[in-house]
């Protein structure tokens, strides 16, 4: 966790947000989205023993570049927090936490599904937000171009929002700006938020690949090019590029 003091705050502020920030494409776009809308934005990352642990380095690079390239956002960008959830990773069996093949399971879900991951992340994020006085929890969950993960559905997150607010006597809002967007539209949203400069930042600095590959830089970013995460990212980028690289809503 960050070494900055985590002073208790009396009430959560509606103009302050906590972004669940992995350092991937989706959470990087969500960070930019939050910085456009909130007066103060903090970030939280989770170390749960993921095979693609390199994303923890990518998130530092993305934050640094956002502050460097977008001074108006830098003034709003607050503390970064990293929470150790390796105990959870040891319990939740998945291709992202163990050396097993990436394939479909008997449940009809990809082996990359980490049972309960987003639910656990949101509980910890809410506890941190409560202490830091942050009223919005922003996540990159999406139910269009996604891998069938049940904890990425909006009805799951609505239920989680209700549970958090009942259990903590707060009024948190879980914001999911990518929920109804395709991956191509996510690239378009990035351009609408920060132009080609933000698109370039996400291509070069963010990390999506489940295999943790950071070797070759493809037009859509770093990655093995074969895992489901790379395939979604590549296909979305190519679709957006072929359509003229327009900003969302243009």
UniProtKB/Swiss-Prot annotation:
Catalytic activity from the UniProt record: 7-carboxy-7-deazaguanine + NH4(+) + ATP = 7-cyano-7-deazaguanine + ADP + phosphate + H2O + H(+)
Domain of life: Bacteria
Pfam families: QueC
Residue positions binding Zn(2+): 209, 224, 227, 230
InterPro entries for this protein: QueC, Rossmann-like_a/b/a_fold
Record keywords, A-Z: ATP-binding, Ligase, Metal-binding, Nucleotide-binding, Queuosine biosynthesis, Zinc
GO molecular function terms attached to this record: ATP binding; ligase activity, forming carbon-nitrogen bonds; zinc ion binding
EC code(s) of this entry: 6.3.4.20
EC top class, as a word: ligase
Cofactor(s) needed by this chain: Zn(2+)
Keyword ATP-binding appears in the UniProt entry: yes
Cofactor, free-text remark: Binds 1 zinc ion per subunit.
Pathway connected to this protein: Purine metabolism; 7-cyano-7-deazaguanine biosynthesis
Binding-site positions, ATP: 21-31
Gene Ontology biological process terms, A to Z: queuosine biosynthetic process
Homology family: Belongs to the QueC family.
Main function: Catalyzes the ATP-dependent conversion of 7-carboxy-7-deazaguanine (CDG) to 7-cyano-7-deazaguanine (preQ(0)).
HAMAP family the UniProt entry points to: QueC
Record's protein name: 7-cyano-7-deazaguanine synthase
Source species: Caulobacter sp. (strain K31)
Gene name tied to this protein: queC
């Amino acid at each position: 966790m960050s070494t900055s003091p985590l002073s208790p705050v009396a009430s959560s502020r509606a103009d302050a947000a906590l972004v669940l920030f992995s350092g991937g494409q989706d959470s990087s776009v969500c960070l930019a989205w939050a910085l456009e809308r909130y007066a103060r934005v903090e970030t939280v990352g989770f170390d749960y023993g993921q095979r693609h642990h390199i994303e923890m380095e990518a998130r530092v690079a993305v934050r640094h570049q956002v502050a460097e390239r977008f001074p108006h956002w830098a003034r709003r960008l607050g503390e970064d927090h990293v929470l150790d959830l390796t105990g959870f990773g040891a319990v939740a069996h998945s291709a992202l936490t163990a050396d097993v093949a990436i394939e479909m399971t008997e449940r009809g879900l990809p082996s990359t599904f980490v049972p309960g991951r987003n639910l656990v992340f949101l509980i910890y994020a809410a506890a941190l937000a409560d202490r830091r006085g942050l009223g919005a929890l922003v996540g990159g969950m999406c139910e269009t171009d996604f891998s069938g993960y049940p904890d990425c559905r909006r009805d799951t997150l609505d239920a989680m929002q209700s549970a958090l607010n009942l259990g903590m006597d707060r009024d948190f809002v879980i914001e999911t700006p990518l929920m109804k967007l395709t991956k191509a539209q996510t690239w378009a949203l990035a351009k609408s938020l920060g132009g080609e400069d933000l698109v370039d930042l996400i291509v070069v600095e963010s990390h999506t690949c489940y295999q943790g590959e950071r070797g070759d830089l493809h037009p859509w970013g770093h990655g093995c090019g074969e895992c489901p995460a790379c395939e979604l990212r590549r296909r979305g980028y190519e679709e957006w590029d072929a359509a003229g690289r327009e900003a969302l809503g243009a």
